[in-house]
Amino acid sequence: MNNIKLHSISRVKVNLYLHVIGKRKDGYHNLDSLVAFPNIGDKIEIYPSKNINLTITGRLKKELPTKENLILKASKLFKNNKNGADIHLNKNIPISAGLGGGSSNAAVVLKLLSKLWNVPLPSIQDIVLLGADIPVCMDWRLQRMQGIGDNTSFISFQGNLWILLLNNGDKTPTNLIFKNLSPNNFSD
């Protein structure tokens, strides 16, 4: 294999506001959110290889199962692909903290594999099936996210935006939050 190495930060996703509008028949919730991507997050490196391999390092590596990782699921979206890659994730984004770490990781890996293999990105429909908020993570500009996360529009913003992120260490899986959300908690 040659010495090609592609790398990128995988930024956290911060919902500056998040309104849950209602629940759809398919179980997903319709959202309205303003999303920012501060320049902090995980680090991902990709090298050519014969197979798809994932290694995880970093202070949070023990909390993240390799086999069920969205990164590996994302790599399978390239249908009929015979290429491989060694993918290295340095995990810094807290898990189950509402910061979109898995979705951001998947988005970055999709972009890097597309570039490494010189193939088009999978369809947005396939990407949404993998994770509803992965499409918004494909571009780090300030965005308004609607629908289940698949309807995005860029927001013009000049200047700096300061955000303080605090994590008390409690895990709060997003799917559990939405599962326990009752209609009287929906935004008007």
Predicted segments with their positions:
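ATP-dependent small-molecule kinase catalytic core of the GHMP/sugar-kinase superfamily
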Residues: 2-36, 115-188
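Short, ordered beta-strand-loop transition motifs
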Residues: 1-2, 49
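Generic hydrophobic alpha-helical membrane-span motif
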Residues: 107-108, 139
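Anion-binding (especially nucleotide phosphate/pyrophosphate-binding) glycine-rich loop
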Residues: 40-106, 113-124
